[in-house]
């Protein structure tokens, strides 16, 4: 779990919409989904501000949402997730109501890189030495069982090593 690409692969490989749908149904699966700890529209800049993003100065005008600044930093870091969508919420912008993390292709890339880096450290991950994760859940609950199965299926489908 210390490998950043391994952690990203798991985060990008989990179809949170399918996972939540097991409890609230397809119609509401995105209703409670947030893509960052703090909502992107939590605060706006009161005045023009210049921010250093990986060595590049970027000026944001007054009224810029916090989420836009966070998204710009994430993009500059090369992390392929969306925590702020300026077109969401009928054009008002939001970090909520969509799954900005799930992307099986990106998960596959991240896990491939993780496996390569871990191999360089002497750790073999292959069909004979697979990654195994234990998920604790109340098997007496159909909802929890379905959620665990959803988690398992989405991770296995989106990572090259299952």
Please state what every model-predicted region is:
Residues 2-158:
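Append "and occasionally in soluble cytosolic enzymes with long acidic Gly/Pro-rich linkers
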Residues 160-162:
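A generic structural motif
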